[in-house]
Regions:
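Hinge/cleft segment of the Venus flytrap/periplasmic-binding protein
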Residues: 276-323
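Periplasmic-binding protein-like
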Residues: 91-102, 120-124, 162-166, 192-193, ...
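Hydrophobic membrane-insertion alpha-helices, especially the h-region
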Residues: 8-24
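Flexible loop/hinge segments that line or gate small-molecule binding clefts
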Residues: 107-143, 254-262
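Hydrophobic alpha-helical segments within soluble ligand-binding/sensing domains
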Residues: 136-161, 253-257, 273-290
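Short beta-strand segments enriched in small/hydrophobic residues
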Residues: 25-54, 134-135, 161-170
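Venus flytrap/periplasmic-binding-protein-like
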Residues: 122, 225-226, 237-267, 304-309
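Extracytoplasmic "Venus flytrap"
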Residues: 39-56, 61, 70-81, 103-105
């Protein structure tokens, strides 16, 4: 090999090494740094007991979109003022988007208009889209109530009163569910009674009254997941109560409730895809923060589930989502 060939060969090697070093230090090919989207999820409960599947979907979207999601619970149950304070705090701390499960939909919308958050809000509930709310993700509560009413009218005795249990009619979606149930039960000749939670033992006292001779049996409907969960736990703990509460229906699904449905404590419930709800909320928050989103309203489809349907596995993917 001549000296000229050796020099050319060495120069080629040095050039390749130089190009490699330059590219690896981003001096030639600079990788575009992806900004992390900070998302605050503020829910309407003091814990995440009713958000298992929602969080699974949320976590999957967080990984896919490389977001930083902060899941925030309330310190006091159904405290709308505290929820407002948390929204303000998260905005001041630099959240790029907020996902809000409102305690009270009407108050939340008014407060958002007052606060003027300056970042997109994904609203978990059926609200009108305005300057504060970028997207709403909801399920038709009236339709769920109407479906439960139909199932009761099809299989239950109109001579047995129906008690509707609620954490509070002012809370998001409960009035719609109430109207839906009564739209069927009233024409069908059922006697309907509303029981709103006033204290920790409201539901238990109402059920205890059934064991007295002067009080008759009744059917129970939990109009929200909190009411349904508490009613199911009370009935599961007492065979005497189950003799007088002839059937339990409700809205909402958790792993515990599905197990109670399988054991016959709950006769039927309305469920929807909470995994998709969690995933979509983060996805839309990331898109809205980047100014890239199309859907303004997303409506999830509810399904009626009883023991037979549960065991058939038709809705297994929806009820028991896996990543």
């Amino acid at each position: 090999m001549s000296n000229r060939e050796k020099i050319s060969w060495c120069a080629g090697v040095l050039l390749l090494v130089a190009l490699y070093l330059l590219s690896s230090t981003d001096l030639i090919i600079k990788e575009k740094k992806r900004e992390i989207c900070r998302i605050s999820v503020i829910i309407d409960n003091v814990n995440d007991n009713y958000y298992g599947s929602f969080r699974a979907g949320m976590d999957m979207a967080e990984k896919k979109y490389q977001a930083d999601v902060n899941f925030i619970t309330l310190y006091a149950e159904n405290d709308e003022e505290q929820q407002e304070e948390l929204i303000v705090r998260e905005i001041k701390d630099g959240a790029n988007a907020i996902i809000l499960a409102p305690v009270r939909e009407d108050l939340a919308v008014m407060k958002l208009d007052e606060i003027s958050p300056g970042c997109p809000v994904i609203f978990l509930g059926p609200t009108a889209i305005n300057s504060s709310v970028a997207c709403s993700i909801s399920v038709d509560r009236y339709e769920m109530g109407r479906t439960i009413g139909e199932k009761i009218a099809e299989s239950e005795d109109p001579a047995v009163p129906v008690c509707l249990f609620s954490e509070g009619m002012a809370y998001t979606g409960n009035l719609d569910a109430y109207d839906g149930i009564r739209s069927v039960l009233d024409p069908a000749g059922f006697t309907v009674r509303l029981i709103e939670k006033k204290s920790e033992d409201t539901y238990r006292k109402a059920i205890e009254e059934t064991v007295y001779p002067e009080s008759g049996d009744f059917m129970a409907v939990g109009m929200d997941v909190g009411a349904l969960s508490e009613l199911a736990d009370i009935l599961e703990g007492s065979s005497v109560y189950r003799e007088h509460v002839t059937a339990l229906y409700g809205i909402g699904s958790t792993t515990v409730l599905l197990n109670q449905l399988d054991r016959g404590i709950v006769k039927g419930l309305m469920a929807w895809n909470r995994f998709d709800e969690g995933y979509l909320s983060v996805e839309k928050a990331v898109q809205a923060a980047g100014g890239e989103w199309k859907e303004k309203r997303i409506t999830l489809t509810p399904e009626y589930i009883d023991g037979e349907i549960l065991r058939s596995g038709i809705f297994e993917k929806m009820l028991y989502p896996m990543e």
